Amino acid sequence: MSTQTRVRHFLADDDLTPAQQREVLELASELKQHPYSRKTYDGPQSVAVLFDKTSTRTRFSFDAGISQLGGHAIVVDSGKSQMGKGETFQDTGAVLSRFVSTIVWRTGSHQNLLDMAETATVPIVNALSDDLHPCQILADLQTCIEHLCPQEGVPGLKGLKAVYLGDGDNNMANSYMIGFATAGLDITIIAPKKFQPKQEFVDRAEKRASETGAIVSVTADISAVSDADVVITDTWVSMGMENDGIDRRTPFLPYQVNDEVMALAKKSAIFLHCLPAYRGSEVAASVIDGPQSVVFDEAENRLHAQKALLVWLMENQPR
């Protein structure tokens, strides 16, 4: 949160306390049942939706969600604006705050978000950065509740075991550690030693876990999938890494989520993937297209979780 402008932003998974995260998730469930029950942006008010990176699910889910909340999304791709082309992100944040009620930004460097938050007087939502993808985690938690503990709701997440296989040094792994620990889920990152999370993000996850009782662990041992309730993977080549010259396929081949890996988890386990997925690489077609896969429920929940986040931010700004 920017101490200079006293605005509550959502730039990282640990910007929400466990109690606040629960409020957002409970609201997400309510909005899924009653999509048009809130008109937070009635007027209509406008929301800036900025993209430095290409998007499908993020763009459609925010655009549709803002419309359902009574607002108007102004969607701008970075190539069609002056952002980052001489004007500072601090200046951009100050100016956009005069035009819109919220700023949603999918960017590269996480520092871009921090810079804009210094001066923005409206909430900023991280729609993805190189470090974190916190909106995706809210959708994933909503999906876990629906499939694993619908009666208990958010409290039912505590003590469940989630495992993430593949590239542990990316934004998804970082957010899974912090966001799942916030909800009380045990989370294990299973990755080759060369591709394990940076200590900074492990420390942040462990700090949150100390509040919720969750267990955060990192290993290269695939047997850690044993008895998992949730099995997760992500693409082995994140956006912007396609031409970095690093072989990202060979080290990850043993970490593909296939039928043998799923057999280690509980029979009731669900499979998550934020998409897009590459069948035959990080996940076998038999898994992502199989009965344990809930990836399309997960994708839909981007809409509901993000709507809930926008409503919560607008209703919980410091007075």
From Swiss-Prot:
One of its GO terms (molecular function) is amino acid binding. Its main location: cytoplasm. PROSITE patterns: CARBAMOYLTRANSFERASE. It catalyses: carbamoyl phosphate + L-ornithine = L-citrulline + phosphate + H(+). Carbamoyl phosphate binds at residues 55-58, 82, 106, 133-136, 274-275, 302. It holds the Pfam family OTCace. L-ornithine binds at residues 171, 234, 238-239. GO terms for biological process: arginine biosynthetic process via ornithine; citrulline biosynthetic process; L-arginine biosynthetic process. The keyword Nucleus does not apply. Pathway: Amino-acid biosynthesis; L-arginine biosynthesis; L-arginine from L-ornithine and carbamoyl phosphate: step 1/3. One of its GO terms (cellular component) is cytoplasm. Belongs to the aspartate/ornithine carbamoyltransferase superfamily. OTCase family. This is Ornithine carbamoyltransferase. It comes from Corynebacterium diphtheriae (strain ATCC 700971 / NCTC 13129 / Biotype gravis).
